[in-house]
């Protein structure tokens, strides 16, 4: 990858690893979950729609209203408030680990709805391993504590929404400018979320922590992150960009420990390892093209003979 792509990759690993910290800060400051989600969505929609309007790419959205609405509902309107609600009851690091199960649900849905996906033995093993990680995470770390179990369940529902949304995007919205698609989806999601935000508004003006958290979530973690990610996809492709999925929970857990003083238990660590292993296996256990290519070049060097005074030697690089 180019230096610019590496910078974008680093930015995305951070920008999609930190939302759990800032969601936790916002809800701990007394901002209701629906209002956190609504505020984040409105801020991001304004930024992305402005960029799409400037690029003249809003026109093709005509006729795509029902697919935009379906995508907005599954990818934004369900996950954003569910994660915020869940983080009222569970640690930010636990929320991030549960969201790491998204590739598992994508693979599970693809077997049923994507004819190009086959239920191979490796994929099924990955699904069982990863879903076992979710069970271990919730069962050991949360146990039978009612509020925490409810919060973890809400975040699992968010992960399912994150998994279903891309299928609609791939089939019906993939040919459009992503700034227009995401901006339009965020605007529709804002309409979905407005009644819930009005029914449960903040009882007091949020403090500096709450306001900063909402600003960072909307502008940086949603709008700017999506623009950077779109550029990264165009340069390196989806395969390499997908590595971010494996880094985000590590960033989120690290921030939860360092900033919030969270201490992930044995169930959280075991669940994270099982979920990441299951995600890798359920996506056919392929390394990202960039890493796979680099490893293949190293192997080729090791296999290549070096002729020195008529004797073939295998030299380590």
Predicted regions and their residues:
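Juxtamembrane helix-entry segments on the extracytoplasmic side of multipass membrane proteins
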Residues: 1-5, 29-38, 60-66, 124, ...
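Glycine-/small-residue-enriched transmembrane alpha-helix faces in small-molecule transporters
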Residues: 1-39, 85, 144-171, 191, ...
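Specific transmembrane alpha-helical segments of multi-pass solute transporters/efflux pumps
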Residues: 15, 19-20, 49-99, 135-136, ...
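Hydrophobic/aromatic residues within transmembrane alpha-helices
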Residues: 26, 36, 40, 86, ...
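Helix-helix packing/entry segments at the starts of transmembrane helices
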Residues: 39, 76, 95-101, 166-191, ...
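C-terminal-most transmembrane helix of multi-pass membrane proteins
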Residues: 41, 139-140, 194, 210-212, ...
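C-terminal transmembrane-helix exit sites in multi-pass transporters
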Residues: 47-55, 59, 83, 102-125, ...
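Hydrophobic transmembrane alpha-helices of multi-pass small-molecule transport proteins
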Residues: 48, 69, 101, 109, ...
């Amino acid at each position: 990858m180019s230096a610019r792509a590496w910078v974008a990759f680093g930015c995305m690993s951070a920008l999609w690893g930190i939302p759990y910290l800032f969601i936790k800060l916002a809800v701990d400051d007394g901002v209701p979950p629906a209002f956190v989600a609504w505020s984040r969505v409105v801020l991001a929609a304004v930024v992305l729609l402005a960029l799409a309007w400037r690029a003249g790419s809003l026109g093709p959205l005509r006729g795509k209203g029902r697919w935009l609405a379906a995508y907005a509902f599954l990818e934004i309107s369900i996950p954003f408030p569910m994660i915020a609600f869940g983080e009222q009851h569970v640690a930010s690091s636990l929320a991030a680990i549960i969201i790491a199960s998204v590739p598992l649900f994508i693979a599970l849905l693809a077997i049923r709805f994507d004819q190009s996906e086959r239920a191979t033995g490796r994929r099924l093993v990955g699904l069982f391993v990863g879903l076992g990680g979710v069970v271990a995470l919730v069962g050991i770390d949360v146990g039978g504590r009612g509020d925490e179990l409810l919060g973890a369940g809400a975040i699992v529902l968010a992960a399912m929404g994150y998994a279903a949304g891309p299928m609609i995007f791939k089939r019906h919205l993939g040919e459009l400018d992503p700034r227009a698609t995401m901006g339009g989806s965020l605007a529709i999601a804002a309409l979905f979320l407005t009644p819930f935000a009005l029914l449960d508004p903040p009882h007091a003006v949020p403090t500096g922590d709450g306001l900063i958290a909402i600003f960072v979530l909307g502008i940086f973690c949603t709008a700017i992150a999506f623009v950077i990610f779109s550029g990264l996809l165009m340069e390196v492709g989806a395969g390499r960009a997908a590595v971010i999925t494996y880094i985000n929970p590590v960033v989120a857990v690290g921030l939860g420990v360092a900033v919030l003083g969270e201490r992930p238990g044995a169930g959280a660590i075991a669940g994270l390892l099982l979920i990441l292993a299951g995600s890798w296996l359920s996506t056919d256990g392929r390394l990202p093209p960039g890493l796979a290519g680099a490893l293949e070049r190293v192997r080729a060097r090791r296999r290549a003979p070096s002729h020195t005074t008529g004797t073939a030697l295998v030299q380590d690089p």
